[in-house]
Regions:
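A charge-rich, low-complexity, intrinsically flexible signal that marks solvent-exposed coils, linkers
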Residues: 1-108
Length: 108
Protein backbone atom coordinates (compact mmCIF):
# COMPACT_ATOMS: atom_id res chain seq x y z
CA UNK A 1 0.00 0.00 0.00
CA UNK A 2 1.35 3.41 -0.87
CA UNK A 3 1.85 6.13 1.69
CA UNK A 4 0.33 8.56 -0.84
CA UNK A 5 -2.96 6.61 -0.86
CA UNK A 6 -3.31 6.81 2.94
CA UNK A 7 -2.05 10.39 3.39
CA UNK A 8 -5.33 12.02 2.20
CA UNK A 9 -7.18 9.90 4.77
CA UNK A 10 -4.92 11.23 7.53
CA UNK A 11 -5.58 14.80 6.37
CA UNK A 12 -9.35 14.19 6.07
CA UNK A 13 -9.50 12.69 9.57
CA UNK A 14 -7.68 15.70 11.01
CA UNK A 15 -9.69 18.30 9.08
CA UNK A 16 -12.98 16.62 10.03
CA UNK A 17 -12.05 17.35 13.66
CA UNK A 18 -11.00 20.95 13.02
CA UNK A 19 -7.26 20.32 12.68
CA UNK A 20 -5.13 21.16 9.64
CA UNK A 21 -3.08 19.53 6.89
CA UNK A 22 -0.12 21.58 8.19
CA UNK A 23 -0.44 19.83 11.57
CA UNK A 24 -0.55 16.41 9.87
CA UNK A 25 2.59 17.33 7.93
CA UNK A 26 4.29 18.56 11.11
CA UNK A 27 3.60 15.20 12.79
CA UNK A 28 4.97 13.27 9.81
CA UNK A 29 8.08 15.47 9.66
CA UNK A 30 8.63 15.05 13.42
CA UNK A 31 8.31 11.26 13.18
CA UNK A 32 10.43 10.75 10.06
CA UNK A 33 12.82 13.67 9.74
CA UNK A 34 11.61 14.47 6.22
CA UNK A 35 11.61 18.13 5.18
CA UNK A 36 8.35 19.45 3.74
CA UNK A 37 9.86 19.32 0.25
CA UNK A 38 11.07 15.73 0.71
CA UNK A 39 7.68 14.70 2.13
CA UNK A 40 5.94 16.14 -0.92
CA UNK A 41 8.41 14.29 -3.19
CA UNK A 42 7.59 10.99 -1.46
CA UNK A 43 3.87 11.65 -1.98
CA UNK A 44 4.43 12.49 -5.64
CA UNK A 45 6.41 9.24 -6.15
CA UNK A 46 3.59 7.26 -4.52
CA UNK A 47 6.14 5.55 -2.29
CA UNK A 48 4.99 2.48 -0.38
CA UNK A 49 5.07 2.57 3.42
CA UNK A 50 8.09 0.28 3.71
CA UNK A 51 10.20 2.51 1.44
CA UNK A 52 8.80 5.67 3.04
CA UNK A 53 10.05 4.63 6.48
CA UNK A 54 13.24 2.96 5.21
CA UNK A 55 14.26 6.19 3.43
CA UNK A 56 13.27 8.45 6.34
CA UNK A 57 16.20 10.77 7.03
CA UNK A 58 16.00 10.55 10.84
CA UNK A 59 13.34 8.51 12.62
CA UNK A 60 12.66 10.39 15.84
CA UNK A 61 14.10 8.58 18.85
CA UNK A 62 11.18 9.88 20.96
CA UNK A 63 8.78 7.74 18.93
CA UNK A 64 9.47 4.97 21.48
CA UNK A 65 7.44 7.11 23.90
CA UNK A 66 4.32 6.56 21.76
CA UNK A 67 2.10 4.14 23.63
CA UNK A 68 -1.48 3.05 23.26
CA UNK A 69 -3.86 1.01 21.16
CA UNK A 70 -4.55 1.32 17.44
CA UNK A 71 -6.94 -1.14 15.79
CA UNK A 72 -7.02 -3.18 19.00
CA UNK A 73 -3.25 -3.66 19.13
CA UNK A 74 -0.79 -1.97 21.49
CA UNK A 75 1.69 -0.08 19.30
CA UNK A 76 4.57 -0.74 21.67
CA UNK A 77 4.01 -4.52 21.33
CA UNK A 78 4.14 -4.70 17.52
CA UNK A 79 7.18 -6.74 16.46
CA UNK A 80 7.27 -6.07 12.69
CA UNK A 81 9.26 -2.81 12.30
CA UNK A 82 7.41 -1.28 9.33
CA UNK A 83 4.00 -2.07 10.81
CA UNK A 84 5.08 -0.52 14.11
CA UNK A 85 6.14 2.70 12.33
CA UNK A 86 2.79 2.80 10.49
CA UNK A 87 0.92 2.34 13.77
CA UNK A 88 3.01 5.02 15.46
CA UNK A 89 1.89 7.41 12.74
CA UNK A 90 -1.73 6.22 13.04
CA UNK A 91 -1.61 6.81 16.80
CA UNK A 92 -0.23 10.34 16.39
CA UNK A 93 -2.95 11.21 13.85
CA UNK A 94 -5.58 9.76 16.22
CA UNK A 95 -4.26 11.99 19.00
CA UNK A 96 -4.42 15.02 16.69
CA UNK A 97 -8.03 14.20 15.74
CA UNK A 98 -8.93 13.80 19.42
CA UNK A 99 -7.83 17.39 20.07
CA UNK A 100 -4.55 16.84 21.89
CA UNK A 101 -2.12 19.74 21.91
CA UNK A 102 0.77 19.46 19.44
CA UNK A 103 3.28 19.66 22.31
CA UNK A 104 1.81 16.48 23.81
CA UNK A 105 1.50 14.72 20.45
CA UNK A 106 5.14 15.47 19.62
CA UNK A 107 6.28 14.32 23.07
CA UNK A 108 8.10 17.60 23.79
Amino acid sequence: MSFASVYPLYVAKAEKKGRSKAEVDEIIRWLTGYSQKALEAQLKKKTDFETFFAEAPQLNSSRALIKGVVCGVRVEDIKEPTMQEIRYLDKLIDELAKGKAMEKILRT
